[in-house]
Amino acid sequence: MKVRRTGAVAALGIVGIALMGCGVQPTGVIGAGEPASGLTRGVRLYFASDSGLRGVSRPDTEIKNLGAVVKMLAAGPGPAELRDGLTSLLQQLGGYTVTGTGTQVTVQLDGPYPESGRDQGTGQLVCTLARAQSVLDPEVRTDDVEVTLRPSDGAALGPYRCAEFLNG
């Protein structure tokens, strides 16, 4: 019994010495930059696809107000996005004014709203404005934004949240 225990201790000692002398030197902390973030930052436009709405990041685009985002959305997807099968179903709005305060966004429309309010074109508008409001007001989460459409002809539509238009 004593021989086995002494042999085991000696073997552990030899293994320990061998591991200490294997040539691996200790290192300090190595900086790797900023941590990865989960969601992209900046403007995100929503376009229609065969599988529902898809967000397209525009990280290098700075926005000053919600009206500018509606103009970007109305311009439609770029060539690469078109090749990926994205399109815009947003109808021409004519004149409009967009305001946002906290989690509330209102689109005042000159004339009637050309859609039902439960279509992908409306979803494009709602999701794009919700994201833009959260960019303009960092205290606001995109999921909490409610968008109301107020045509001068007809009843108000909404408030809508982006999640109502996303599949899955």
Task: Give, region by region, the residue ranges found by the protein language model.
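Bimodal "functional hotspot" detector
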Residues: 2-168
